[in-house]
Design a protein with these regions (language model features):
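Conserved glycine-bearing catalytic or ligand-binding loops at nucleotide- and phosphate-handling centers
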Residues: 9-69
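A common structural junction motif
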Residues: 29, 111-115, 151-158
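Hydrophobic side chains in well-ordered alpha-helices
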Residues: 21, 103-106, 146
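Long, charged, helix-rich clamp/arm modules that form nucleic acid-engaging surfaces
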Residues: 95-96, 120-176
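Short, small-residue-biased leader/transition segments that mark boundaries at the very start
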Residues: 2-6, 177-181
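A short, contiguous, amphipathic alpha-helix enriched in charged residues
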Residues: 93-117
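Short hinge/gating elements
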Residues: 4-11, 84-93, 131-136, 165
Length: 181
C-alpha cells in the first residue's frame, strides 16, 4: 500500500539558517515565479549545528535542483606551532552527526595500530566555550600530511546525503517539485 512507499522513503533534509529560510519564503511570496537560483541568493546552503566546512557548492546545487545530493563536509582545523618546535592540529568544528568521542577514539585507534604515524598525543579540551580537539604531532612531521590522512581515514570528512522529500496533498514529492505546487 501507500504506507509501504512512505516507509521506504527516508527524508534527510539538512538543517538551515532560519533567517535565510525566512528571506527565501519572502522572495517566493514577492515573486511566485522565482527560480531555485533566486532562492539560493537568500538560502546559501545548509547550516550545520556542529559547523564544519562544506566543500564546494555542487552537492548543495544538486540537492536544491533535484531533491537529492551529496554534500561533502570537513572538520574545521588549525595548525599551530608549539614552543618546543613541534606542531599540533586543533579541531574546532566537526561534520554534522559525527560523534566527537568516537572520532577521538578512532584517531587513537589508528595511532595505536600504527596506521597513522606522527601523532604523539590526542586529547579533548572542549569546554563551554566550544569544541577543541588537540592532536599533538611528533617532531619533523608534516602537519598537512597527517591532516589529509585523518580526513581520509576518520569521520573528520563526511558526506551528508540530502534526500529532500515532502508530503504535499498526500503525494510524496522532492522539495524541488513541491515548490511548483
Amino acid at each position: 500500500g501507500l504506507g509501504d512507499v512512505y516507509k521506504r522513503q527516508a527524508t534527510n533534509i539538512p538543517p538551515h539558517n532560519l533567517g535565510e529560510v525566512i528571506d527565501g519564503v519572502i522572495c517566493m511570496i514577492d515573486n511566485p515565479d522565482c527560480t531555485i537560483d533566486d532562492l539560493m541568493q537568500h538560502i546559501k546552503g545548509p547550516d550545520f549545528p556542529t559547523g564544519g566546512i562544506i566543500l564546494g557548492r555542487r552537492g548543495i546545487r544538486e540537492a536544491y535542483y533535484t531533491g537529492h545530493g551529496r554534500i561533502e563536509v570537513r572538520a574545521k582545523t588549525n595548525i599551530e606551532e608549539m614552543p618546543n618546535g613541534r606542531s599540533r592540529i586543533v579541531v574546532t568544528e566537526i561534520p554534522y552527526q559525527v560523534n566527537k568521542a568516537k572520532l577521538v577514539e578512532k584517531i587513537a585507534e589508528l595511532v595505536h595500530d600504527k596506521r597513522i604515524e606522527g601523532i604523539s598525543d590526542i586529547r579533548d579540551e572542549s569546554d563551554r566555550q566550544g569544541m577543541r580537539i588537540v592532536i599533538e604531532l611528533k617532531k619533523d612531521v608534516y602537519p598537512q600530511v597527517i591532516l589529509n590522512t585523518l580526513y581520509k581515514h576518520t569521520s573528520m570528512q563526511e558526506t551528508f546525503g540530502a534526500n529532500m522529500l515532502a508530503l504535499v496533498n498526500g503525494c510524496l514529492l522532492y522539495t524541488s517539485d513541491a515548490a511548483d505546487e
